[in-house]
């Protein structure tokens, strides 16, 4: 087992937002814009349609003609501090795990999706009758929680382990959930797709499903070095020997009980 010590790299401050501002339609749109690296127009319009579930509306995205002609998908890429958690009370269910991403960068698709959805609600267009009573001014918006997006729809997703100068390793996430949940928080990219627009009274959010997680294949631990500084120590020797699965420190918050008094993701849809 190699232990290659890497000094922590200082990064520029990430955009921040107050909890109150992230719970307004205007606030969440502005925050999504602040973490977008581009303002290139991607979305022509969004339509919300009634579904078999009273509280859920399906989401139909129409991309701009130039993107549609290139057969571009409506997937959204995010980057941020990522951690996979267990739901202790749901180990026998498909949502026994969920992903928390503290987003530091996002595709412009994200803010344009939010902008289009709440623009529709404001103008009472391209929405089902069940949403006509909503006012964008009084909505409590829950897509972000603590500047993070929570994703519990993981079925069918892939995980790609990457390492500089070496071939990446692609696997189905189903076989990686246990080992990923034992990793510490680390920077990763995620490709997600919107699932439904969820409403409960005046609380709303867009829910997402994970399509792909792109993560450094090294398992690292944050330790306090001899000088008192925080250092990141590589704990992985060879992914092909499955050390990526079997090594890693269990984070203190590794298991998350939705029935406990802890804060939890809202709208498990």
Curated annotation (Swiss-Prot):
Pfam families reported in the protein's UniProt record: Pox_I3
Induction: Expressed in the early phase of the viral replicative cycle.
One annotated GO molecular function: single-stranded DNA binding
Subcellular location: Host cytoplasm
Main location: host cell
Any one annotated GO CC term: host cell cytoplasm
Keywords associated with the record: DNA condensation, DNA-binding, Early protein, Host cytoplasm
GO biological process, one term: chromosome condensation
UniProt keyword Ligase present: no
Taxonomic superkingdom: Viruses
Subunit organization: Homoomultimer (Potential). Interacts with the small subunit of ribonucleotide reductase.
Function: Plays an essential role in viral DNA replication. Binds to ssDNA with high affinity and localizes to cytoplasmic factories where nascent viral genomes accumulate. May disrupt loops, hairpins and other secondary structures present on ssDNA to reduce and eliminate pausing of viral DNA polymerase at specific sites during elongation.
Homology family: Belongs to the orthopoxvirus OPG079 family.
Protein name: Protein OPG079
């Amino acid at each position: 087992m190699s232990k290659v010590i890497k000094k922590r790299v200082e990064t520029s401050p990430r955009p921040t937002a107050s909890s109150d501002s992230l719970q307004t339609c205007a606030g969440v749109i502005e925050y999504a814009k602040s973490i977008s690296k581009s303002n290139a127009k991607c979305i022509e319009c969004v339509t919300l349609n009634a579904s078999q579930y009273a509280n859920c509306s399906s989401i139909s995205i129409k991309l701009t003609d130039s993107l549609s002609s290139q057969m571009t998908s409506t997937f959204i890429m995010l980057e941020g501090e990522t951690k996979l958690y267990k739901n202790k009370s749901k180990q026998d269910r498909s949502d026994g795990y969920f992903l928390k991403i503290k987003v530091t960068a996002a595709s412009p698709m994200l803010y344009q999706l939010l902008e289009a959805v709440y623009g529709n609600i404001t103008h009472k267009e391209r929405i089902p009758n069940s949403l006509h009573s909503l006012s964008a001014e009084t909505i409590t918006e829950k897509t972000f929680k603590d500047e993070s997006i929570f994703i519990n729809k993981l079925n069918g997703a892939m995980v790609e382990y990457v390492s500089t100068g070496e071939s990446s390793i692609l696997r189905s996430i189903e076989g990686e959930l246990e080992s990923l949940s034992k990793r510490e928080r680390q920077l990763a990219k995620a490709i997600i797709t919107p699932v439904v627009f969820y409403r409960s009274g005046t609380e709303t959010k867009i829910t997402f499903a994970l399509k792909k997680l792109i993560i450094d294949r090294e398992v690292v631990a944050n330790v306090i070095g001899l000088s008192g500084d925080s250092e990141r120590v590589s704990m992985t020797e060879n992914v092909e020997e499955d050390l990526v699965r079997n090594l890693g420190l269990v984070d203190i918050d590794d298991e998350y009980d939705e029935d406990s008094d802890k804060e939890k993701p809202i709208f498990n849809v």
